[in-house]
């Protein structure tokens, strides 16, 4: 009820020209009211067309000076603009401004309007259509837009998932890099500590040797000085004494004088000293990274006893040593050390047969003066071929090994030359620090066997390339005739 009254009031205060609520309403003598702007425009048009002004509704002429502002209507419009229909009174399909049913669609403004809106100044001249006519067209457009948005939503969700995945990946990678950096610098600190300790030990040894020599020279010089001083004292006494004292034993004194020679002390020029050079940290770090990489392929190697080898094996199958020699006596009681096995062989194979992939293991050879280790293609059926002779340690016979002799001579065994095929080509290896622990890396597909000096920060000792692995190969250890055992290290050691 209140809603209907309100609509009627709105119709009474609506401008007949623009069909909007009156703005600055002006009233004519006939009683009709118009917006100031609308009436002014109509007055100008009427004066041009007819030479007089008339009411747009009832056509009664009026004089401009008789136009008066309608305060009462202005107050009603002002109050009406403040009034809002209650939710119960509102109708979705009715115009909020005019209360008429919304049956038209303005194409230019994209709005649903009523017939009064269509005639208003706001929509005058626009293309309007019945809502039923354009609903299907816009439904198709909106459906297509909806499908497109759903597709974009799916793409956005996929991109969001990709970003989350990339974010997690980057976080993992950075954390991995942080761990590596910490490990690298920890290794560098260990290397620096080791180098510092080693260099200080060298300096202390140098100081000890030089001071010992200088002390010896100092003692000799003190003795020489004392001898010369005594001779001078004897001569002074003779010269100051009587003739008898002067000539008594003078020949001996003269001979002593002639025999006086000063032995110059041994000197140690500082400019000839060994110059300290800082370690190549970059090179050490590269070596450390290479060693870290190959250690990912560390396998737990043990040895396998066989009838050919006479090597002594520990219970855990990790430690290998040579047998103790037998003591025999000759016909005249002479003692001899010999090995009862005629086909003496201390070499032993690892229990793992390798036919593919990458494999790494480490061998502890500390305190040993002789050893051979590496990779072997297996023992030959003929035991005589396995007797320990250097000519057998050649790649063509299935041995890719390096060895140590006399505690200092480190060598690799390559195939002999065309002229001396029976003798291996022994490659002397320059090892700054004799290894106490050796790492062996076998890459079956790449046909390479590499040896690393774990004692010296993992520097590469030697590498066999283009190896002919035509059959399974095995880790190989040989303690030689040195009584100290060699031990296969576990990955956790």
From Swiss-Prot:
Example of a GO biological process term: innate immune response
Annotated B30.2/SPRY domain residues: 281-493
Coiled coil (UniProt feature): 131-240
Lineage: superkingdom: Eukaryota
PANTHER family given in the database record: E3 UBIQUITIN-PROTEIN LIGASE TRIM
Protein's recorded name: Tripartite motif-containing protein 5
Source organism of this protein record: Pan paniscus
The protein's role, per its UniProt record: Capsid-specific restriction factor that prevents infection from non-host-adapted retroviruses. Blocks viral replication early in the life cycle, after viral entry but before reverse transcription. In addition to acting as a capsid-specific restriction factor, also acts as a pattern recognition receptor that activates innate immune signaling in response to the retroviral capsid lattice.
Domain free text: The B box-type zinc finger domain and the coiled-coil domain contribute to the higher and low order multimerization respectively which is essential for restriction activity. The coiled coil domain is important for higher order multimerization by promoting the initial dimerization.
Cross-referenced PROSITE patterns: B302_SPRY (PS50188), ZF_BBOX (PS50119), ZF_RING_1 (PS00518), ZF_RING_2 (PS50089)
Pathway in which this enzyme or protein is active: Protein modification; protein ubiquitination
Assigned EC number: 2.3.2.27
Binding site for Zn(2+): 95, 98, 117, 123
Residues in B box-type zinc fingers: 90-132
Sample GO molecular function, one term: zinc ion binding
Gene that encodes it: TRIM5
Entry keyword Zinc: yes
Top EC class, one word: transferase
Modification type N-acetylalanine: residues: 2
Keyword annotations from UniProtKB, A to Z: Acetylation, Antiviral defense, Autophagy, Coiled coil, Cytoplasm, Immunity, Innate immunity, Metal-binding, Nucleus, Phosphoprotein, Transferase, Ubl conjugation, Ubl conjugation pathway, Zinc, Zinc-finger
The UniProt record lists the keyword Nucleus: yes
Required for interaction with GABARAP and for autophagy: annotated segments: 185-198
Record's comment on post-translational modification: Degraded in a proteasome-independent fashion in the absence of viral infection but in a proteasome-dependent fashion following exposure to restriction sensitive virus.
Modified sites of kind Phosphoserine: 86
Subunit structure: Can form homodimers and homotrimers. In addition to lower-order dimerization, also exhibits a higher-order multimerization and both low- and high-order multimerizations are essential for its restriction activity. Interacts with BTBD1 and BTBD2. Interacts with PSMC4, PSMC5, PSMD7 and HSPA8/HSC70. Interacts (via B30.2/SPRY domain) with HSPA1A/B. Interacts with PSMC2, MAP3K7/TAK1, TAB2 and TAB3. Interacts with SQSTM1. Interacts with TRIM6 and TRIM34. Interacts with ULK1 (phosphorylated form), GABARAP, GABARAPL1, GABARAPL2, MAP1LC3A, MAP1LC3C and BECN1.
């Amino acid at each position: 009820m209140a809603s209907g009254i309100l609509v009627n009031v709105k119709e009474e205060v609506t401008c007949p020209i623009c069909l909007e609520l009156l703005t600055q309403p002006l009233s004519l003598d006939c009683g009709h009211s118009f917006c100031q702007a609308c009436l002014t425009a109509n007055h100008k048009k009427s004066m041009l067309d007819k030479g007089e002004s008339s009411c747009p509704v009832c056509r009664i002429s009026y004089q401009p000076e008789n136009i008066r502002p309608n305060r009462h209507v202005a107050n009603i419009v002002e109050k009406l603009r403040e009034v809002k229909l209650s939710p119960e009174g509102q109708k979705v399909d009715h115009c909020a401004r005019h209360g008429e049913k919304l049956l038209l669609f303005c194409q230019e403004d994209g709005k649903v309007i009523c017939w009064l809106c269509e005639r208003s100044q706001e929509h005058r001249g626009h293309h309007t259509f019945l809502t039923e006519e354009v609903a299907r067209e816009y439904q198709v457009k909106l459906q297509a837009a909806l499908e497109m948005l759903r597709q974009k939503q799916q793409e956005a969700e996929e991109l969001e998932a990709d970003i989350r995945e990339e974010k997690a990946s980057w976080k993992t990678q950075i954390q991995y890099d942080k761990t590596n950096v910490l490990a690298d610098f920890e290794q560098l600190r260990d290397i620096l500590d080791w180098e510092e300790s080693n260099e200080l030990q060298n300096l202390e040894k140098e100081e000890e040797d030089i001071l010992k020599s200088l002390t010896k020279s100092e003692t000799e010089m003190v003795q020489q000085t004392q001898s010369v001083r005594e001779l001078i004292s004897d001569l002074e006494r003779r010269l100051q004494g009587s003739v008898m004292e002067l000539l008594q034993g003078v020949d001996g004194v003269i001979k002593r004088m002639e025999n006086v020679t000063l032995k110059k002390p041994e000197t140690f020029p500082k400019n000839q000293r060994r110059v300290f050079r800082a370690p190549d940290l970059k090179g050490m770090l590269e070596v450390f990274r290479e060693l870290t990489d190959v250690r990912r392929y560390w396998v737990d190697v043990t040895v396998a006893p066989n009838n050919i080898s006479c090597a002594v094996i520990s219970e855990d199958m990790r430690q290998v040593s040579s047998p103790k020699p037998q003591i025999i006596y000759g016909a005249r009681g002479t003692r001899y050390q010999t090995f009862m096995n005629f086909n003496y062989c201390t070499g032993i194979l690892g229990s793992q047969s390798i036919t593919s992939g990458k494999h790494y293991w480490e061998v502890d050879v500390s305190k040993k003066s002789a050893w051979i280790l590496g990779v072997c293609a297996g023992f030959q059926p003929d035991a005589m071929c396995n007797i320990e002779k250097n000519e057998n340690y050649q790649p063509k016979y299935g041995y890719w090994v390096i060895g140590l002799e006399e505690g200092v001579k480190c060598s690799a065994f390559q195939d002999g030359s065309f002229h001396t095929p029976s003798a291996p080509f022994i490659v002397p290896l320059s090892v700054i620090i004799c290894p106490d622990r050796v790492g062996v890396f076998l890459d079956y597909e790449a046909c390479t066997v590499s040896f690393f000096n774990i004692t010296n920060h993992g520097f590469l000792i030697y590498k066999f390339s283009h190896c002919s692995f035509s059959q399974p190969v095995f880790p190989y250890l040989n303690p030689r005739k040195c009584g100290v055992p060699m031990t296969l290290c576990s990955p956790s050691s």
